[in-house]
């Protein structure tokens, strides 16, 4: 009996050790974040955007898919939010969101992204609405002389085993994600993301968003726990002009796609 118990304990210990295989490391000692990452199967299904329904009487509300921002908007932003509908969403025209490709909150919507890491750069590729980010990790400063862009200018640094990505210099033409929702931002947007590979199969991602022209306080994005996907290459799911036109047409037929 004692022998059987000892064998069982050893078996469980071995299984636990196997399940918690440490994160791989680069030659320089930093964790290797490379791999295809997704939310796994244990996350709740994200809410579906509302279908056409009668508008309530009174002032136009902030559409449900932008409610996440309501506690953060300043008064000017709240006024603007009430005038915008789905048809104003630039992601329906195949434009990327401000977080770039590995959007912390977009994983709630099933985003799949691939990370490729070298000693000087971390490259992040998105499967949906394909785009990419090239993040230098060699200590260089922001390229303030570059024109603003939808992905901004990102630089990375290591804080222990955590990759910290600081992104500034955004244009105000695209929108940002908020826990699966989308809304506008200004050119003062500043995002700090943190990527920590806990073990071989698990990575935590979190971020803090600041935008003094739109938000009254920083928005701290809920931490996401991602899993290493059982495949090593993403697909290229193009957002084409035909798909974009269909999305815009559908948005224009809902009440939330119409300005009051």
Regions found by a protein language model. Give the residues of each.
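Positively charged n-region of N-terminal signal peptides that target proteins for export
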Residues: 1-5
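N-terminal signal peptide c-region/cleavage motif recognized by signal peptidases
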Residues: 14-16
